[in-house]
Curated annotation (Swiss-Prot):
HAMAP family per UniProt: RecA
Protein's recorded name: Protein RecA
Family of the protein in this entry: Belongs to the RecA family.
GO terms classed as biological process: DNA recombination; DNA repair; SOS response
Biological role stated in the UniProt entry: Can catalyze the hydrolysis of ATP in the presence of single-stranded DNA, the ATP-dependent uptake of single-stranded DNA by duplex DNA, and the ATP-dependent hybridization of homologous single-stranded DNAs. It interacts with LexA causing its activation and leading to its autocatalytic cleavage.
Organism: Xanthomonas campestris pv. campestris (strain ATCC 33913 / DSM 3586 / NCPPB 528 / LMG 568 / P 25)
Length: 343
């Protein structure tokens, strides 16, 4: 590219960033766009794929996928990580389906978790807004957008046609919420479901659509698509799901990265399984036939035994994780001269 074009592009990029904010346009090769506070997801693979080490605070995040794909599990693990760091978490259970026993198994301190089971969509979003405005809650999870039923629909008859009511509710709520979220530096996670568009027959066009209109797609800084792609077996018994998570949108680092991880029943995302898979990829763990070795030590025949070894020897798992983080996680981008900590 000649110098005139370079200067013109540089001026255009700086004008775009000035007008629309940092991260609104980026080169795909850029590793880290801005240093931002994050809450780890509980999945090392996903933290690295997100490019910033977790879910960004002060932003809206949408997690969507088919039923039983691991959406709520992922958010509960993020809540557990937030609590480990001394943060406060709130769960707005519009589906009225949260299982506190399962949440506790994933590491959530259910005694300290703020829980709301609202009657209407307006009530749910108003509670979320009040928690955000308090500036004392680190993460608010809303489960799910599909269950945010407008008051008019609840008070109406069963067969009433009320088109676009939920989409208008979401659009209005997000307009109100986003400024408060940024000011309070709270992470707000919306869980969403998928529906099928009727009559979509165009090649290459997906018939799947998320509920609640288009507003959330625009306001979300990060969108994650999570899907079950297979079963994990121990002999003939199915002990978990193999899950693919794709970063569909990311305003803070290059998007479209995807990871394949394991969600074990009653345990959540398998930290040890991820360490083994990433260790093999990074050539830190050697796989010869069915045997896995780390350093000079054999850690197990078959992945399940290797996973058990790391679980029984946490110091080995911590050492391997530290090496993997050093290898995979990008270092913080150096600040330019004159750039201040707070924008």
């Amino acid at each position: 590219m000649d110098e005139n074009k370079k200067r013109a592009l540089s001026a255009a990029l700086s004008q775009i960033e000035k007008q629309f904010g940092k991260g609104s346009v980026m080169r795909m090769g850029d590793r880290v766009i801005e240093a931002v506070e994050v809450i780890p997801t509980g999945s090392l693979m996903l933290d690295i794929a997100l490019g910033i080490g977790g879910l960004p605070k002060g932003r809206v995040v949408e997690i969507y996928g088919p039923e039983s794909s691991g959406k709520t599990t992922l958010t509960l693990q993020a809540i557990a990580e937030c609590q480990k760091l001394g943060g406060t978490a709130a769960f707005i259970d519009a589906e009225h389906a949260l299982d506190p026993i399962y949440a506790a198994k994933l590491g959530v301190n259910v005694d300290d978790l703020l829980l709301s089971q609202p009657d209407t969509g307006e009530q749910a979003l108003e509670i979320a807004d009040m928690l955000v405005r308090s500036s004392s809650v680190d993460i608010v999870v809303i489960d799910s957008v599909a269950a945010l039923t407008p008051k008019a629909e609840i008070e109406g008859e069963m067969g009433d046609q009320l088109p676009g009511l939920q989409a208008r509710l979401m659009s209005q709520a997000l307009r109100k919420l986003t400024g408060n979220i940024k000011r309070s530096n709270t992470l707000v996670v919306f869980i969403n479901q998928l529906r099928m568009k009727i009559g979509v027959m165009m090649p290459g066009q997906s018939p799947e659509v998320t509920t609640g209109g288009n507003a959330l797609k625009f306001y979300a800084s990060v969108r994650l698509d999570i899907r079950r792609i297979g079963a994990i077996k121990k002999g003939d018994e199915i002990i978990g799901n193999q899950t693919k998570i794709k970063v569909v949108k990311n305003k803070l680092a290059p998007p479209f990265k995807q990871v394949i991880t394991e969600i074990l029943y009653g345990e959540g995302i398998s930290r040890e399984g991820e360490l083994i898979d990433m260790g093999v990829e990074a050539k830190l763990v050697d796989k010869a036939g069915a045997w896995y070795s780390y350093g000079d030590e054999r850690i197990g025949q078959g992945k399940d035994n290797a996973r058990g070894y790391l679980r029984d020897n946490p110091q080995v798992a911590i050492k391997l994780e530290a090496e993997l983080r050093e290898k995979f996680q990008p270092a913080e981008a150096p600040r330019e001269a004159g750039e201040t900590e707070s924008e």
